[in-house]
From Swiss-Prot:
InterPro entries recorded: AAA+_ATPase, ABC1_TM_dom, ABC1_TM_sf, ABC_transporter-like_ATP-bd, ABC_transporter-like_CS, ABC_transpr_lipidA, P-loop_NTPase, Type_1_exporter
Record EC number: 7.5.2.6
Assembly mode: Homodimer.
Keywords: ATP-binding, Cell inner membrane, Cell membrane, Lipid transport, Membrane, Nucleotide-binding, Translocase, Transmembrane, Transmembrane helix, Transport
SMART domains xrefs: AAA (SM00382)
Domain ABC transmembrane type-1: 28-310
Protein name: ATP-dependent lipid A-core flippase
Pfam families with a match to the protein in the record: ABC_membrane (PF00664), ABC_tran (PF00005)
Classification via PROSITE patterns: ABC_TM1F, ABC_TRANSPORTER_1, ABC_TRANSPORTER_2, MSBA
Transmembrane segments: 16-36, 64-84, 153-173, 253-273, 275-295
Amino acid sequence: MHNDKDLSTWQTFRRLWPTIAPFKAGLIVAGIALILNAASDTFMLSLLKPLLDDGFGKTDRSVLLWMPLVVIGLMILRGITSYISSYCISWVSGKVVMTMRRRLFGHMMGMPVAFFDKQSTGTLLSRITYDSEQVASSSSGALITVVREGASIIGLFIMMFYYSWQLSIILVVLAPIVSIAIRVVSKRFRSISKNMQNTMGQVTTSAEQMLKGHKEVLIFGGQEVETKRFDKVSNKMRLQGMKMVSASSISDPIIQLIASLALAFVLYAASFPSVMDSLTAGTITVVFSSMIALMRPLKSLTNVNAQFQRGMAACQTLFAILDSEQEKDEGKRVIDRATGDLEFRNVTFTYPGREVPALRNINLKIPAGKTVALVGRSGSGKSTIASLITRFYDIDEGHILMDGHDLREYTLASLRNQVALVSQNVHLFNDTVANNIAYARTEEYSREQIEEAARMAYAMDFINKMDNGLDTIIGENGVLLSGGQRQRIAIARALLRDSPILILDEATSALDTESERAIQAALDELQKNRTSLMIAHRLSTIEQADEIVVVEDGIIVERGTHSELLAQHGVYAQLHKMQFGQ
């Protein structure tokens, strides 16, 4: 079992390496800097021999005259290499995290709806934000610890003497200076931390909008828009992180330089006869070693494996998502605009993970330009039929045709470009009203076209009352708008899209009577010259449909016009009687 685990960890790291490899130049520079850093410590320790043997053993003061300059030079070199190694490793880490996030984000946008049905939004957000950050632990944190501590283990032990009493008055003099440096850096840290927290919120919000509005992204072809939006905030997050690293990395060399000046003062003071007579070689050795210990922060090797394993575990969860199969897009047929003829032939469909079919042997024709309404009790399969038209799910048996061709013959982009969707659960993005109406295609439509769509959707009356009109930011998922206003923006979006096929999935079910009247007028405008599939619980909204289809337990049980179905005294008549009390 142990060997299997080791093999799994190694395989995971090998798979992660291609993500790190493009930034290996940063690793090489960091490695060289770490080696020079360790070499400076080793050379510093080697100075103890001439110090003890010549400087004190033979009272050759010339050694103590040139050694301060060497020490200062070594400390400057150490500070520079420490900064370079920390910055380069963190640069690689930031690039790796950003690359993983972009891969995850792009992969998730290509996942089928069934994937999101089985996953919670919080879990997926955690994968994009937290787990991808954990990858840095394996690609940078553990790496820098192992290399640095492996190359300079003696330096780590010496750091235990950082607060040694032997530093005596020198540390007392240094304390206020170090305190000021720490206070200045701490303020910088707080400022950057706030910016990082705000930016992380933007990253999470961007990802959450894509995840919650996945269907809208697919229908309106908004993958590129969402990718650009996510890339922007993700890169902003990376830059904030680099500012934090820069401030952190430069603070250590400053403190180290202060300590090196103190060391130089100790050595210079020791060259005076009055001072030399009161010191022993052992005392100088302790002070010297303690000052060296100040040059490097204490790094612990005890938690490296745990840190590395956390990173590998995060990699495995991310790779599990990246290994998930995306939507099958094997069709080749591309069209500009469909006529709008739809037909279901012996369609049977079962949701993934379930055994009982949601639809059984569905046969349905919707001629171009006609309106067909689906009615039935909750859970009867009405919305499932609509989801199959857009290929959010693929059927088990039968065929669904558009203009005489199976839907699977079309590319997904071409197919979904023919369909506009208005549902009861409208998803709006944290953007302007205009950009929401022209979602994913803002460059294709003029301002006049957007305004005309809003006017036809009876939305301009409330838009004109907003502070910035069409340029008003409406908040996350349109939180600043009422239900009716959100519905009208969705209708304006569908009008502007001008697709030949329209799906209305209980578009007015959650509205009050006044809002429903305004929206119904907009829907009537929207349905003109389009093939429409309406799903409704309120039977009053579908009485004028060309055909009403009654679905019960995944089977079509009745079909006909409103008057014909009432005359049959069947399921539709019962539903009508229940609603209107007749």
